[in-house]
A protein has these predicted regions:
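Flexible phosphate-sensing "switch/lid" loops adjacent to ATP/NTP-binding sites
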Residues: 1-240
Length: 240
């Protein structure tokens, strides 16, 4: 719905219109003040409208980019104002250069430092990598980022995106997230979900094929093919 999608253009248009309507009562309109407040307002309104217990806000891009700095500032304000129950989950990539064959944690360490310089200490770290992160690197990340080791979650490549929830749960993400919000950890029954994942995996391994054309503008970028640009459409076709 409209409440689930926010762009910079929408925010600026709303603020400019309010200023033109004298809703700020002559107060100077400042980007660093009023835009983050409007972001927070939209998140709160989405929760009210949808009667949500939790609101998940994805901030795209990379820490340090000018395009998302106002959203990060809004997150900082929410995290430290009025004791709001907010969790910041940072996703970082640990590359394994083929020439070295070793998983490197330095890029994630630097991205967390960049985030901390913006006023946010992450509560959780999703360690995205080709394979499962080992205990040694998890401890290194905990030491260098001030994120508890139990809050560092491994996110290796999986055959299907639907395998991700089970992978996170096995690494303790569910229990730690509930603990962060002072909520009791309930006994989980993931059998139905795991059965769905098994069915999807069987379909993907099937030798039967159906040709479906997806016409899109952004499949190519120079010499590279962008496999995830229309991922929502493609995943819907896979299990539709």
């Amino acid at each position: 719905s409209k409440a689930n999608y926010v762009t910079n253009g929408q925010l600026f248009q709303t603020i400019i219109q309010r200023e033109r309507n004298f809703e700020y009562e002559g107060e100077d309109v400042e980007v660093a003040l009023h835009v983050p407040e409007e972001i927070i307002n939209r998140l709160e309104q989405a929760a009210i409208k949808l009667k949500a217990d939790f609101v998940i806000c994805e901030i795209g891009g990379t820490v340090g980019e000018y395009q998302n700095i106002l959203f990060i500032e809004a997150n900082r304000i929410m995290k430290y104002r009025d004791g709001r129950p907010t969790a910041h989950v940072h996703v970082g990539y640990l590359p394994t250069p083929p020439s070295i064959g070793e998983m490197k944690s330095k890029p994630v360490q630097n991205s967390v430092k960049q985030l901390v310089s913006s006023g946010i200490q992450p509560d959780f770290l999703i360690a995205r990598a080709q394979g499962k992160i080992d205990e040694r690197r998890k401890q290194t990340l905990a030491w260098t980022t001030n994120i508890p080791a139990e809050n560092i979650v491994s996110a290796p490549n999986v055959a299907s995106v639907y395998s991700v929830p089970s992978s996170f749960d096995k690494d303790g993400f569910t229990d730690q997230l509930l603990k962060h919000f002072d909520m009791p950890s309930k006994k989980k029954d993931l059998r139905k979900w795991n059965n769905l994942v098994s069915k999807i995996n069987r379909v993907q391994k099937s030798d039967k094929t159906v040709n479906i054309a997806v016409v899109g503008k952004y499949f190519d970028s120079g010499d590279f093919k962008l496999s995830d640009v229309y991922v929502s459409v493609i995943e819907a076709l896979k299990h539709g």
